[in-house]
Design a protein with these regions (language model features):
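Conserved ATPase-coupling elements of RecA-like P-loop NTPase cores
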Residues: 83-86, 110-113, 223-226
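Canonical P-loop GTPase G-domain recognition
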Residues: 99, 107-170, 181-192
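Core catalytic machinery and nucleic-acid-binding channels of phosphodiester-processing enzymes
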Residues: 73, 78, 85
Length: 354
């Protein structure tokens, strides 16, 4: 019997076990192109797939890439840049050339110019000791700069294979789907290739007669909010369109709540400016710090707020702010641009979240 594979993740299609990769209801087996249930939910409902990838498997993947002479396409998330970095990437992929795709441009305000974003990404990579061949600012959702991406891949690969790397939720699937449309004859079946030392199947897209593009599996960043929220909350916290900055003037001993997911206390300082960049779904409230715990518990009972049952389950991080503006990033959730010279703040997030 010919194996049928999910055209989203490459898993072998089966309808026997809902908990195993590749599951689809029998009613879907007659379709010409089949997405497994997990890929279908991810594509249509923005629900995350359960990860079957271990850290050891992920490291083996990177080490295997490092042993090859190839072009690495590294996809990062502009909205959560630090949270989307693959730890120790350059240590594992050796001296291979790297093309960076800075995704999710559509989420950031239009007032941020593309060339400034490009320069900022290059500067951030330089601080991490990474010098990519090139950086392209893109939006998978809006098909932004994809012709430029395809041209640069063809320019930089020099006939070599291409490996796409990135953690989950950076938009890798959208990019791969566009690559499929650009390079593949839709009448041909997509092939997969098993990675040495793992049980992982990779989607393989032929680029020409001698080379291919491989989609490496992503891994969850355990320090991102997206790794701990329920599936129903994932679409709630992940922006689906351009974020609208919300500005608050805070005096000392005032607090801001970000639904039930995070809280900032302004503990000391003159009046400060707090500009918040979060999903439009996020309910953001300002209150006096002395009323903050009461407000949290009251709204928790109304199911307005999120995952932590009380503020005591969250960990507090204290910061003294500099004279200039400072961004406070809550990985996988959003960020706050604060201008409160020499002020002091306390940030509450669940333990383990950066």
């Amino acid at each position: 019997m010919t194996e049928i594979r999910c055209y989203g993740c490459g898993a072998i299609i089966q309808s026997a076990d809902t908990k195993k990769p590749g599951y689809v209801p029998e009613s879907a087996l007659s379709k010409e192109k089949i997405l497994c249930q997990r890929c279908y939910k991810l594509m249509h409902y923005h629900q995350k797939m359960e990860s079957h990838l271990t850290k050891d498997d992920f490291l083996r993947v990177l080490q295997t890439v490092g042993e090859k002479d190839c072009l690495v396409v590294y996809i990062v998330d502009l909205f959560d840049f630090n949270g989307s970095l693959v730890p120790g990437l350059m240590r594992h992929i050796g001296y291979n050339d790297v093309l960076v795709l800075a995704n999710k441009r559509d989420i950031l305000p239009k007032s941020l110019k593309e060339h400034r974003l490009n320069t900022w990404v290059r500067r951030q990579f330089k601080e991490y000791g990474i010098k990519p061949l090139d950086v392209v600012v893109t939006s998978g959702k809006k098909n932004m700069n994809f012709d430029e991406i395809f041209d640069k891949i063809d320019e930089y690969r020099h006939g070599r294979d291409v490996y796409v790397v990135g953690i989950t939720n950076v938009g890798k699937s959208t990019f791969i789907n566009r690559m499929l449309k650009n390079y593949s004859d839709t009448t041909n079946l997509i092939t997969t290739s098993e990675f040495p030392g793992t049980t992982l199947d990779l989607i393989k897209i032929p680029l020409d007669d001698h080379s291919s593009l491989y989609d490496t599996p992503g891994i969850l960043n355990e320090h991102q909010y997206t790794s701990i929220v329920d599936e129903k909350d994932l679409a709630y916290i992940m922006p689906q369109g351009e974020v609208r900055p919300m500005s608050f003037q805070l005096n000392s001993d005032q607090s801001i709540f970000f639904s039930g997911f995070a809280r900032i206390d302004y503990t000391k300082g003159n009046k400060g400016n707090f500009i918040c960049y979060f999903s439009r779904n996020m309910q953001i409230h300002r209150t006096k710090t002395e009323k903050a715990d009461e407000l949290f518990n009251r709204h928790k009972q109304l199911q307005v707020y999120g995952p932590a049952s009380s503020m005591k389950e969250m960990k507090a991080y204290e910061f003294t702010l500099p004279e200039e503006k400072r961004d406070i990033v809550i990985s996988g959730l959003g960020f706050i641009c604060i201008h409160a010279p020499k002020g002091k703040i306390k940030v509450y997030v669940p333990e383990g979240i950066d």
